Amino acid sequence: MRNGLATLATLATLVLVAAGCLAGASALAEPLSCGVVLMHGKWGMPQSPYLKPVVQKLEPTCQVKLLEMPWSRWRLYDKPYADAQAQIRQAVSEFRQSGVQWVAVGGQSFGANASLAYMAQVGDADAVLPMAPGHVPENFYLISDVRRGIDAAQQAVQAGQGDTLVDMTDMNQGQRRQVKASAAALWSYFDPQGLGNMALSARSFRKPVPVFWAIGTLDPLYPSGSAAIYQQLPAHADSQYLVVQANHANTPEAASEALWLWVKARTGR
C-alpha cells in the first residue's frame, strides 16, 4: 500500500513538473507584440505607393507608423537630419510606451538611409528594414552643379551662418530639382562624411541588431555599393541580404512577402 501511495505521489509530482514545463514553454513561445516605423523616400510622402504593399503585408502582424520626413515633397529639408532622427525616436518611444515589445525602423530609399543613421545615432530599435537604400551624398558631391550648393551650405555653416538660405540642385534617381533651405539643414543631409553616408552609419551601429536589407537588380546602388555597405554592418545571425528582380521604386513590393515572413520569424507571430 505504501509503495502504491509512493508511486501515486511520484506520478503526481511528475504531472505537476510536466505541467510547469508546458506552462513555461507556452510563456516562452508567446508572440512578441511588434511595431514598425516606416519612412518614405526623397520627395515622397507617408502614404507612399512604394511602401503600400509592405504596409498591407505587415499590418495584420504589426502596428505600423508612417512618418512624413523633412525630405518629403512638401517639406524639402525644412529641418536638419538631427531633427529627423528625433522624429524617429519619438515614434519608437510611442511604441515602447504603449507596451510594444519589438520595434523595427525601416523605409525605402532616403527612408532606408535614415533607418541606418538612426541605429548609428540612437540605436534603440530591435531591427532595421532598409529597402532600396538611397541618398548617397558622397556620390552627389562628385556632380558639379550639386557640389556648388553643398559647398555653399558648408561655407555658411562654418561661418556661423547656418540659418542662411541656400539654393541647391538636388538629385533623385537621375532627376534634378532646385531646392532652397537653410545651410545647416542642407549640410546635415549632403555632407559627404555626415549622417547621410550609409557606409559610415552601417559601421557605427550602437549595437548589433538583425537587418533585413532588400535591393533590386535594376537599382543603381545594386552594382555600385549595396553589398559593400551591407558588409559594414555588425554581424548578426538573423540578418538577411535579399536581392529581388526590381528597380528602385518597386523593390519594397517585390520584397514584401519575404519581409513579412522575416518579421514573423523574429516576433514569433
Located regions from the model:
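Catalytic histidine-centered segment of alpha/beta-hydrolase-like enzymes
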Residues: 77, 246-256
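Active-site nucleophile elbow and catalytic-triad environment of alpha/beta-hydrolase enzymes
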Residues: 184-203
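Active-site nucleophile loop of the alpha/beta-hydrolase fold
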Residues: 129-140
